[in-house]
């Protein structure tokens, strides 16, 4: 999980999800997991 000030989709399988006022990127590739913080 990477924590970044700005999250974005890296590939086509990445999807942006909003949970508890946090933006998350979830993907089949575990390297693409991101969280905004």
Curated annotation (Swiss-Prot):
Entry similarity comment: Belongs to the bacterial ribosomal protein bL36 family.
One Gene Ontology MF term: structural constituent of ribosome
Alphabetized PANTHER family for the sequence: 50S RIBOSOMAL PROTEIN L36, CHLOROPLASTIC, LARGE RIBOSOMAL SUBUNIT PROTEIN BL36C
Name of the featured protein: Large ribosomal subunit protein bL36c
Localization of this protein: Plastid, Chloroplast
Domain of life: Eukaryota
Principal localisation: plastid
Record GO biological process: translation
A cellular component annotation (GO) from this entry: ribonucleoprotein complex
Keywords annotated in UniProt: Chloroplast, Plastid, Ribonucleoprotein, Ribosomal protein
Lineage summary: Eukaryota, Viridiplantae, Chlorophyta, Nephroselmidophyceae, Nephroselmidales
